[in-house]
Amino acid sequence: MTRIIVGIMGPGDGASAHDCDRAAQLAGLVAAEGWILLTGGRSAGVMEAASAAATRAGGLTIGILPGTDWTQASSAVAVAILTGVGEARENINVLSSRVIFVCGISAGTAAEVALACKAGRPVIFVSAARETIDFFRSLHARFETATSPHEAMTIARQLLAPAP
């Protein structure tokens, strides 16, 4: 059986401490669930916080990197995939993830959410700002919201549960 890969997406450079804390908490829960964590793979912001927390919790981490330089990868990424496609890697991130958790927002993260909505991938915003929710709601995007990492995991389990 194929293992479940879930993505944690959020700002790299410029990520808030709150976004990184939520991502780290969530990544620990993802690892405890036995799911594989996918991030953008760099040693910055939400990507680093999530990868490091999942690794500490004994989880497997995958990083989808924009360039062709191994040194871009976080040391907490177990499987680094160099794409050489720059920001277009966001589509790989989205299509490789069964569920996308969003911790914070940036231009790159917004692009990932838009791609996920177009591809029909479940998106769960974790402690998102009202402006972010209102923006994506104005696009008629389908997504879930959670106020905590634990609530986000409950939603993800429901979304990933086999149909009866």
Please place each PLM-identified region on the residue numbering.
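Generic N-terminal amphipathic, Lys/Arg-enriched alpha-helix
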Residues: 2-19, 28, 32-33
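Acidic/glycine-enriched connector segments
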Residues: 21-28, 41-119, 129-135
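A positional/architectural concept
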Residues: 34-35, 39-42
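Short acidic-hydrophobic, aromatic-tinged amphipathic segments that line or gate anion-handling sites
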Residues: 80-84, 126, 141-155
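A charged, well-structured terminal subsegment
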Residues: 99-100, 146-164
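Catalytic binding pocket for nucleotide-activated donors in carbohydrate/polymer assembly enzymes
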Residues: 131-145
